[in-house]
């Protein structure tokens, strides 16, 4: 399975429902949110949008053993590869990979049995550059297939009331991603700027949004640092 740094960071950083109720403003709704975030089997649902190889979906399944994880993608070859990766993993009974357009999930044909408590996405990020000659790389990297607006709007419609949308984007796309999320109704709750070395500016930023107003927790992470190894230690041999 191809493993990228962006996907590994997001899969290790994104919150599951176990961490949702740390916010003092949500304590009084804890039982309500727990019930809303669970399907008929009592498991929370985590949705990985644009799952690719299934890396993030598998990481979330490893981190949250009671969660049912659904990964979706519009690339049939990617879906087939992700399904093979899931079948070879210890989490095959809790991870489902579907050939599915994210926009279609808001319709009555949605395969979700209850609102997801977490949506994770490593979205395409090229907007006004020339298309890549490789069609599959174009699909993965150009946001014609999934704009930030579509991501934010559909995530708002699908997420449970106490749910969280977590993404990783280039730092030069942060303002645009935040603007679309706020326009959809979200509030930024966590930000982690990612550096490749301590003396270089951040290249990526991890962002988490919730439906309720919150004061964002802002941190910085350097690839290769002790903090980075602590965050990702469960996913590297």
Per-region residue spans from a language model:
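S-adenosyl-L-methionine
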Residues: 1-17
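Conserved Class I SAM-dependent methyltransferase catalytic core
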Residues: 3, 145-202
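Residue-level signal for inorganic ion chemistry
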Residues: 10, 122, 151, 209
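Conserved SAM/SAH cofactor-binding pocket of Class I
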Residues: 12-18, 42-109, 116-133
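Intrinsically disordered, low-complexity segments used as extracellular stalks/linkers
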Residues: 16-44
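Mobile active-site "lid"/loop adjacent to the S-adenosyl-L-methionine
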Residues: 123-150
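SAM/dcSAM-binding transferase cores
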Residues: 198-237
């Amino acid at each position: 399975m191809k493993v990228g740094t962006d996907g590994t960071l997001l899969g290790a950083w994104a919150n599951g429902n176990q961490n949702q109720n740390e916010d003092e403003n949500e304590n009084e709704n804890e039982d309500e949110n727990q019930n809303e975030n669970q399907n008929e089997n009592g498991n929370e649902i985590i949705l990985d949008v644009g799952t690719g190889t299934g890396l993030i979906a598998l990481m979330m399944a490893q981190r949250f053993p009671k969660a049912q994880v659904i990964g979706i993608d519009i690339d049939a070859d990617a879906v087939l590869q992700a399904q093979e990766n899931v079948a070879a993993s210890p989490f095959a009974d809790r991870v489902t990979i579907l050939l599915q357009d994210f926009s279609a999930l808001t319709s009555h044909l949605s395969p979700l049995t209850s609102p997801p408590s977490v949506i994770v996405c490593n979205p395409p990020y090229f907007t006004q550059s020339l298309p890549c000659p490789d069609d599959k790389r174009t699909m993965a990297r150009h946001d014609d297939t999934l704009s930030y607006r579509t991501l934010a709007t559909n995530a708002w419609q699908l997420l449970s009331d106490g749910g969280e949308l977590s993404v990783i984007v280039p730092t030069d796309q942060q303002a645009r991603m935040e603007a679309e999320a706020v326009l959809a109704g979200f509030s930024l709750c966590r930000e982690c700027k990612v550096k490749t070395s301590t003396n270089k500016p951040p290249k990526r930023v991890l962002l988490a949004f919730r439906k309720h107003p919150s004061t964002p927790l802002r941190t910085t992470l350097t690839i290769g640092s002790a903090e980075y190894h602590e965050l990702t230690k469960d996913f590297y041999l």
